[in-house]
Amino acid sequence: MIDETLFDAEEKMEKAVAVARDDLASIRTGRANPGMFNRIHVDYYGAVTPITQLSSINVPEARMVVIKPYEASQLRPIEDAIRNSDLGVNPTNDGNVIRVSIPQLTEERRRDLVKQAKGKGEDAKVSVRNIRRKAMEELTRIKKDGDAGEDDVARAEKDLDKTTQQYTHQIDELVKHKEGELLEV
């Protein structure tokens, strides 16, 4: 019962870190990166679909992304979705592919993006702490019901704290890395 609780908590924390990693990847840096487009969706025959599933995304140069839709009819919707996103880029459509030139980030925009990255990191850490809190409540319930001894529960609580620290540290490292990418000129 205790092991199950710890395993579930660790699994959920791992997912929270994965979500944070994806969130941070979607914040654009000064370089072209296909991950920037992970959060952009297009209405594809009535279904909201990520553009990563509707096209191939290549980075031929450091500041250029080329998006080639699998269907030519999706050129305009993909272009519009990118233009309306919060990436701050202006795609051009040559009838065959969509080219997205990544402009140089201004110092002010870099600071805003660092704030955004820190906010996403903090959200992920809150999520990890909430998972810890729920697991602690479950451990308290196990102890109260007499399903496990006090020593076992205390040891499990210590393990849970170590796991929580490990995952919050991972999130801090992800944010620090992203901050370095953003501030690099």
UniProtKB/Swiss-Prot annotation:
Which residue spans traverse the membrane?
none
- Cell compartments where the protein resides: Cytoplasm
One biological process term from GO is: translational termination
> Where does the protein principally reside?
cytoplasm
Q: Which CDD domains match?
A: RRF
Return one GO MF term: ribosomal large subunit binding
Among PANTHER family, the record links this protein to:
MITOCHONDRIAL RIBOSOME RECYCLING FACTOR PSEUDO 1, RIBOSOME RECYCLING FACTOR
* Family annotation (NCBIfam families): frr
So what family is this one in? Belongs to the RRF family.
**HAMAP family attached here?**
RRF
The protein depicted here goes by the name Ribosome-recycling factor
- Protein's gene: frr
